[in-house]
């Protein structure tokens, strides 16, 4: 929004920004930065305009000063329209000037997976009612969008993401050297344990990759979502440990 009405901001780390040029009022625009490459332009515009109209209706009986105070309120402060426990405005870099815990507390936790994102249609019925109120987004359209997003998520995981992570696991090999310390042995045992947990099946126990693929194929998306988050964490841990392991080799 800007530091003051006279000092515009070009903070582009936020979800939606008001971009202004004091020398050209007609250049004022809103900038939404949450869309991904798969976003359907027509659907997102329908949702945006429906949400804007809901906000316009709520603000129609309030002064501009009251509306500014509403969007500038602190988390925990009661407002006439916006959620009590959320903050909506920042002139700071939200990635550099806030910790992850602060971002979550003030602005909400972003969904970690596509499944978590799609669950928001069920978790927030009041917000769903807002974007469907005008009739542009019918239940059939939303359900078709949801089904398409989940199919693409499943396909991406099985056909691309899991194979790429499997390659990372296979590339983490034990170093062949005559000079090995106890630290090297300790690190390799941890690394190999993670490798096996991620990618190696046994008769009695399935690897995380196999469990994730099975959950996706069985349509158990809640389980698959949790396993995807765990997979990312384990792969990052593996890469970090292997980097330290390799650097200690001489």
Model-found features: residue ranges?
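C-terminal accessory/tail domains of diverse enzymes
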Residues: 1-250
